[in-house]
Amino acid sequence: MSILAYNGGCVVAMRGKDCVAIATDHRFGIQAQTISTDFKKVFHIGPRMFLGLTGLQTDILTVRDRLMFRKNLYETRENREMCPKPFSAMMSSFLYEHRFGPYFIEPVVAGLDPKTMEPFICNMDLIGCPNAPDDFVVAGTCAEQLYGMCETLWKPDLEPDQLFEVIAQSIVNAFDRDAMSGWGATVYIIEKDKITERTLKTRMD
């Protein structure tokens, strides 16, 4: 078994029309054993920016803390809010610094640019190779199932309500086909004037 799949979990982010969505499951386990059903994998790190991390639980918490430290240092030095693109570049550089002893995580960044309100999504591998497409990004143990669902349901210029429906159906149907993730999901819809958080109740097995 890959160390990335040891604790299970999944994250998916999608672009819409002037909005972006990010969703995650709730499971934290050790291989097939479920330890808790409320482990947080998506973190609110800016007014319109979220970071999702899947992989090894200890590395998720370590990387979250170290990236928050670097982000706060940047904002103190520059005296301005950090945008999703520079944050992704900083995270890519941080992960590549540790390429010979990497953190076993797959990060996903989703947010809106503070000036242009342009939606931005990005994911990386464990040594920080970035991928910023125009549609969706996935990470975690049910990535293959998520790719299939997202490719089927996603289309350009989805409104916030439509985007919620698409991302919710995608993640629920994907982790229902994966024993290492699931136990409910949380979806965040980021718009220029508000952030909506919704919790999905699903099969608890």
Swiss-Prot record:
A single BP term in Gene Ontology: proteasome-mediated ubiquitin-dependent protein catabolic process
CDD domains in the record: proteasome_beta_type_3
InterPro entries reported for this sequence: Ntn_hydrolases_N, Proteasome_beta_3, Proteasome_bsu_CS, Proteasome_sua/b, Proteasome_suB-type
Lineage, broadest ranks: Eukaryota, Metazoa, Ecdysozoa, Arthropoda, Hexapoda
Superkingdom of this protein's organism: Eukaryota
Gene giving rise to this polypeptide: Prosbeta3
Keyword presence, Translocase: no
Keyword Cell membrane set for record: no
Protein name (database record): Proteasome subunit beta type-3
Subunit structure: The 26S proteasome consists of a 20S proteasome core and two 19S regulatory subunits. The 20S proteasome core is composed of 28 subunits that are arranged in four stacked rings, resulting in a barrel-shaped structure. The two end rings are each formed by seven alpha subunits, and the two central rings are each formed by seven beta subunits. The catalytic chamber with the active sites is on the inside of the barrel.
Disulfide bonds: none
Stated family: Belongs to the peptidase T1B family.
Organism: Drosophila melanogaster
